[in-house]
Amino acid sequence: MMEHRVTPFLWYDSQAEEAATFYVSLFPDSRITSVSRYPEGGPMPAGQAMVVEFELEGLPVSAMNAGPIFSFTEAFSFSVRADTQDEIDRLWDALIADGGAPSQCGWLKDRWGLSWQIVPGILAELQNDPDRERAARAMQCMMGQTKLVIAELVAAADGR
């Protein structure tokens, strides 16, 4: 596997290990690679996960428990290309469960406030269609959706 020198680093209040365990359960070829824990006398309880390193389909990610100093915003999101509606539905439902929140255009926040985009693979093809009217219809449809629905995007692009 290729060594990555640049990786996302996520700041959690105290739920990094729980979040990482959940995320790796959603994606194939994903795993927790290491967990370092706070020692006695640290800023968090001894034994609590300090930094959790994990891979999402080969992408290395680090997550740290460091208290309620910072919160996630939409300025950072994970974008996931989903090839089928079943995959979109599965990921969407799992990520908004237990306190997550849907947003517009395929965006959502998970229960920890981290933003995700669940995007059908065909969307880029529709948006880049040389028939600019077809592309505009697909874009207009997407702008009105919460969870993206492939059949509706294609129907809109086709003028149906």
Language model region names:
Residues 1-2:
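Extracellular, disulfide-bonded carbohydrate-recognition/adhesion ectodomains
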Residues 44, 69-70:
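Gly/Ser-enriched beta-turn/beta-hairpin loop segments
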Residues 12, 16, 26, 56-60, ...:
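Vicinal oxygen chelate
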Residues 134-160:
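Acidic/histidine-enriched, glycine/proline-rich intrinsically disordered or flexible terminal extensions
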Residues 9-58:
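Core segments of cupin and vicinal oxygen chelate
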